[in-house]
Design a protein with these regions (language model features):
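Glycine-rich flavin
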Residues: 1-55, 70
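Short Gly/Pro-enriched turn/cap motifs at secondary-structure boundaries
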Residues: 21-24, 98-102
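A generic structural signal for well-ordered coil/turn residues at beta-strand boundaries
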Residues: 29, 54, 79, 86, ...
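Short helix/loop capping segments that flank catalytic or ligand/cofactor-binding pockets
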Residues: 43, 50-52, 92-94, 118-121
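Glycine-rich beta->alpha junctions and the first turn(s) of the following alpha-helix
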Residues: 99-197
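C-terminal helix-coil-helix/basic helical segment that borders enzyme active sites and/or dimer interfaces
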Residues: 199-206
Length: 206
C-alpha cells in the first residue's frame, strides 16, 4: 500500500479504496516496458511473488526501454517504473513447490506485449512522484524491506542466544569438568555474539 502515495488518486482508490480486501503483490525477475500511445507495452517473467494469491493487483518493476536500450533519467540511472496489473488478467505460474514457507504462495506470472495504461504505473521512492505527502511515505520502500527482514533475523538471533545461555547453566560437555557457562571460550563467544547483535540493532535503529 506504500505505492498508493505515488499512484494517481483515482488509481489508488481503485486498488485500495473501493475494495476493502484490495492488495498488491510483486516479485523479482526480468521485466521491460516500452512507451506506446497512452501507456506501456510490458513483457515480463516474474517469480517469488509472495502474497499473490491473496492480492487483487500485481506489480512488475520494469526497465524502461527506448530503441531497445534502457532509458536513463536525469541522474544517469536506469529508469524503472512499476506497472500495476489486475490479477484477474494474468495466469499464475505455479512454481512455489517447497517444504517451508508454503503459505507465502510465492508463485509467478509472465506477460508478453501486455498493455498497461499510463496511469497504472508508478516510480517508487522518488519524492517528486508523490501524489500524497505525509512523513510515512518519505520512508523508502527498500528501507521497509530492510527493517522488516533484519528485525526478524535479529529476533531469531536474540532468542537463540538466550536459549544457549539458559542451556549453558547446566550443560556439561562429555569429559568436561565444568558446565558450559564456566568455559572461558564460551564466555568470550557469547560476549562477541551479544556485541554483534547489539551493534546490528543500533545500526538499524540509529
Amino acid at each position: 500500500s506504500m505505492s498508493a502515495a505515488t499512484a494517481q488518486p483515482d488509481v489508488a482508490r481503485l486498488i485500495w479504496g473501493d475494495d476493502p480486501a484490495g492488495g498488491l503483490a510483486w516479485g523479482p525477475g526480468k521485466a521491460t516496458a516500452v512507451p506506446v500511445d497512452d501507456g506501456y507495452s510490458v513483457t515480463c517473467d516474474l517469480a517469488f511473488c509472495s502474497g499473490m494469491h491473496n492480492a487483487t493487483w500485481l506489480g512488475a518493476h520494469c526497465i524502461m526501454l527506448e530503441d531497445g536500450e534502457p532509458m536513463k533519467g536525469a541522474d544517469g540511472k536506469t529508469v524503472v517504473r512499476t506497472m500495476l496489473i489486475p490479477k484477474s488478467e494474468i495466469k499464475i505460474n505455479v512454481i512455489w513447490d517447497v517444504v517451508g514457507l508454503r503459505a507465502t504462495g510465492s508463485d509467478g506470472y509472465a506477460l508478453e506485449d501486455y498493455f498497461v495504461p499510463a496511469a497504472h504505473s508508478v516510480i517508487r521512492d522518488k519524492d517528486e512522484e508523490l501524489t500524497y505527502r505525509a512523513p510515512l511515505y518519505l520512508f523508502r520502500q527498500t528501507n521497509l524491506f530492510a527493517s522488516g527482514f533484519s528485525g526478524v533475523a535479529m529476533g531469531i538471533a536474540h532468542s537463540m542466544l538466550q536459549a544457549f545461555k539458559k542451556l549453558s547453566i547446566d550443560k556439561r560437555p562429555r569429559l568436561a569438568k565444568t558446565v558450559l557457562k564456566e568455559n572461558t571460550v564460551v564466555q568470550a563467544d557469547v560476549a562477541l555474539a551479544e556485541a554483534r547483535l547489539n551493534a546490528a540493532r543500533t545500526f538499524l535503529i540509529s
